[in-house]
Each structure stands twice: as structure tokens, then as C-alpha cells.
From Swiss-Prot:
This is Holo-[acyl-carrier-protein] synthase. It is found in: Cytoplasm. It catalyses: apo-[ACP] + CoA = holo-[ACP] + adenosine 3',5'-bisphosphate + H(+). Pfam families: ACPS. GO terms for cellular component: cytoplasm. Its cofactor is Mg(2+). It comes from Lactobacillus delbrueckii subsp. bulgaricus (strain ATCC BAA-365 / Lb-18). Keywords: Cytoplasm, Fatty acid biosynthesis, Fatty acid metabolism, Lipid biosynthesis, Lipid metabolism, Magnesium, Metal-binding, Transferase. One of its GO terms (biological process) is fatty acid biosynthetic process. Mg(2+) binds at D8, E58. Belongs to the P-Pant transferase superfamily. AcpS family.
Length: 137
């Protein structure tokens, strides 16, 4: 069952400016493993990668319902690139499945995150509650 959906977009020019200033923003936003992937990229790909990861984290926090802050930090969400280049997003605060997508052109980067609740335990609790509610005391 879908818990929620989050979307974020950011201008490429904004990310390009922070990439041009050095690694400070990247170190703040990216996990250690994301930063390791980031370091191996060309300048143009660094902009796309950092912007995409920032947008994914923002989209996740919106789907979580809080935004980035006390409830969700940049470290709580990690999106790594598979060998095929597809993003795989995980979180240390959410145990369900996370579906993510990043799109970019020369001007904007957009990310979408869908959170899917772990179905097994919810379904089991629902069935158990239904069975117990029909019992005589």
C-alpha cells in the first residue's frame, strides 16, 4: 500500500554554483557512500548527481510529511547508482519500499519518491483485529 508520494525540483544553475564553490555542500547533503560516487564524476555529472540526490532527499522528506529538519536529515536517505545507472534509494528511518526517479535537463532537476508501506505486518494486524473483533467475550 502506498504511504505517500513526494516531488521536488531544483534549478541546475543553483546546484552548479554550489558545485563550483567546492565540496562543502556535497559533504553536507551526501552520505559517505554517495560522496564516494560523486567524487569520481565529471563536473557536469557532479551537478546532475548532487542535484538529483538533493531533490530525492527533499522529495522523501515531503512524502514523509515533515520536510528536512528534525524528523528527516540528509543522512537518513541514501540514493546510490547501480551499474546500469539506475538510482536505488534506501532509508534508515523507513522500512518499506522506496521507489525513486530522477529526471534532468539543462535547466531543472526533478525527483519523485513513492513510499510503500511494508504490507506484511499491516495486513496481518488487520486480519487479526478483524478476527478478534468477532469473538465473544
Amino acid at each position: 500500500m502506498i504511504k505517500n508520494i513526494g516531488v521536488d525540483q531544483i534549478e541546475v544553475d543553483r546546484i552548479a554554483k554550489v558545485v563550483d564553490r567546492g565540496d562543502g555542500f556535497a559533504r553536507k547533503v551526501l552520505t559517505d557512500r554517495e560522496f564516494a560516487q560523486y567524487q569520481d564524476l565529471t563536473h557536469k555529472r557532479k551537478i546532475e548527481y548532487l542535484g538529483g540526490r538533493f531533490a530525492i532527499k527533499e522529495a522523501f522528506s515531503k512524502a514523509w510529511g515533515t520536510g528536512i529538519g528534525q524528523a528527516v536529515s540528509f543522512e537518513d536517505v541514501e540514493t546510490l547508482r547501480t551499474e546500469s545507472g539506475a538510482p536505488v534509494t534506501t532509508s534508515r528511518i523507513f522500512t518499506g519500499r522506496i521507489f525513486s526517479s530522477i529526471a534532468h535537463d539543462d535547466h531543472e532537476i526533478v525527483a519523485v519518491v513513492v513510499l510503500e508501506e511494508p504490507a506484511g505486518w499491516r495486513r496481518a494486524i488487520g486480519k487479526l483485529s478483524h478476527l478478534l473483533s468477532g469473538r465473544k467475550k
